[in-house]
Amino acid sequence: MTVSSQSPVKKQLHNAIQPSNGQYEYHDKLSTLGMRIRQAVDNGYQGVSVHNTANNTIAATSGSNGSNSSINGAGFSNICVQDNTRFTIPEYKRVALAKQPPMLVNQRTVSMNSNLEQWEQNLDQRLSSIDDDIMRNKLGASDFLSGASKRSFDDLEF
């Protein structure tokens, strides 16, 4: 038995698939599509400034892109800009609240001031009522005081 110093060569059972460039010709463009959309929206909001609607309307109807880009100063065509001057935008006025703002609770809920002393007093009352309920409950008191233990059927009271 001789041990050879060379490692055995593995035989490939299948041929590797070669990547084709034609299949993914738009891959690079698609990977940056979201960023390009964000940039176009950002440029559109910053670049288009409508100061004089009469000049912009004339430029939009003139049909030459050179005059349109010189009117709005941003290099955008006014064909892309929406002209909503014929629609009236209602002016919203904020309604003044009453002197006492409405309560954020229903009629059954008792409203209390935010006072730490009252809260602690109510907490003490609630905790003492919980303790009383536990002590009154025969099953709960025995489980609470002696720990959880199993009972037989004979121990149950009907």
Swiss-Prot record:
GO terms for biological process: protein localization. It is found in: Cytoplasm; Nucleus. The keyword Mitochondrion does not apply. One of its GO terms (cellular component) is nucleus. Pfam families: RNR_inhib. InterPro entries: RNR_inhibitor (IPR013900). The keyword Nucleus applies. Keywords: Cytoplasm, Nucleus. Mediates the nuclear localization of the ribonucleotide reductase. This is Damage-regulated import facilitator 1. It comes from Kluyveromyces lactis (strain ATCC 8585 / CBS 2359 / DSM 70799 / NBRC 1267 / NRRL Y-1140 / WM37) (Yeast).
